[in-house]
Regions:
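Non-catalytic, solvent-exposed segments at the cell envelope interface
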Residues: 4-221
């Protein structure tokens, strides 16, 4: 992310050796995509946080962090994903993976961590877990997706897991084929969670933005 300087402080404050700090800095530079973040007075930045938690007793890790930047002049929307496995200096915690900020302090700490590390103002945020996302997508009537054979195979495993947690009938929500189709909330969320098909987490963030974009299209129609 061009113009975003990940802040890692001295080894005394983080508990890391100089070698470990240098290694983290190198990983950040290697894994950071070359994208210009919207950052001016005409842009309204909303951080969308997708939370992975199995129960309601803790905040959970942030499985997805997408900055939705709305240009107030052109009305265009730009979406930028933050990679969950990047290391960041979490305020009052130390250097951890970026997705851990949510577990330590919920949405407010995720916002503060991204603002501090990326020097980026965030005007508001919204946080949603898998359960809520399933219900939201079902409420808009589902979305259009075109999963591959490999994506269908992995997504069905996630569907089984989510249906078990929600006491739902997995057979009613399983993908039965690949290709263009209208999917429900379970299928869409499972698709967005896929990580080990394609280019690892980079392609997962693409799927997450795709699902979000398709959902917004349905809401406008």
């Amino acid at each position: 992310l061009v113009g975003s300087e990940m802040c890692i402080r001295d080894s005394e404050s983080t508990g890391l050796t100089d070698e470990e700090t240098d290694a983290l800095q190198s990983e950040i530079l290697n894994e950071t995509q070359d994208i210009e973040l919207p950052n001016n007075s005409n842009v309204y930045n909303i951080l969308l946080i997708g939370v992975d938690r199995r129960d309601k007793t803790w905040y959970g890790n942030s499985d997805s962090m997408i900055l939705m930047s709305i240009n107030k002049d052109t009305k265009q929307i730009h979406m930028t994903s933050f990679m969950r496995d990047l290391y960041a200096n979490i305020p009052d915690v130390g250097v951890k993976k970026l997705n851990a900020a949510c577990a330590y302090g919920g949405g407010p700490l995720v916002v503060r961590t991204i603002e501090d590390n990326y020097k980026l103002p965030i005007d508001n945020y919204a946080s949603v877990d898998f359960d809520s996302m399933i219900d939201i997508i079902d409420a808009v009537g589902g979305i259009e997706l075109s999963p591959s054979d490999d994506e269908v195979r992995v997504a069905n495993n996630y569907i089984n897991e989510m249906c078990k947690l929600r006491n739902a009938d997995a057979s009613a929500h399983q993908y039965t084929s690949s290709g263009d189709q209208h999917v429900d909330g379970y299928q869409a969320v499972a698709y967005a969670r896929i990580r080990y098909v394609g280019n690892s987490d980079y392609q997962r963030t693409e799927r997450q933005r795709e699902v979000l974009s398709k959902m917004m299209q349905e809401m406008k129609s």
